[in-house]
Amino acid sequence: MKVKTILVSQPEPSNEKSPYSRLEEKYKLNINFRPFIHVEGMNAKEVRQQKIDFNNFQNIILTSRNAVDHFFRLCKEMRFAVPDSTKYFCQSEAVAFYLQKYVVYRKRKIYVGEKKIEDLEAVFKKFNKETFLFPTSDMLKPDVPDFLNKSTLNWQRAILYKTV
């Protein structure tokens, strides 16, 4: 039995020098690209309906690159200038490095965990009197909210994007 068609669950590569194009030519295959998960940002009106005012939060908890993108996109859309004093708590180093796209990277205001949100527990205890914003998708595993509740932090979840 010979394979004629391959389904790849990611967006189609923009350049022609991708390994997929070489596979197509070499083995005369038909490769279909269909992303199974699509992330759609919410607009400012939908965020305001959640009664979220970005001015009320000194700290932002970021768990993914999507959260970073949509938080800063909505800040721009709502004409909110993020203060320099804002502290960012990133679940992993990858998210922290991605944050450089929007913020000047200074060690004193970006706190990084190793892989899990629990890695930041000691840092959260230092700032337990301040308010935290937690930008998320509409679908969220209960692990992080359970941990934040257990840590007795003053935090609020903001649904900034939807997984379709």
Please describe what each predicted stretch is.
Residues 1-164:
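Conserved beta-alpha
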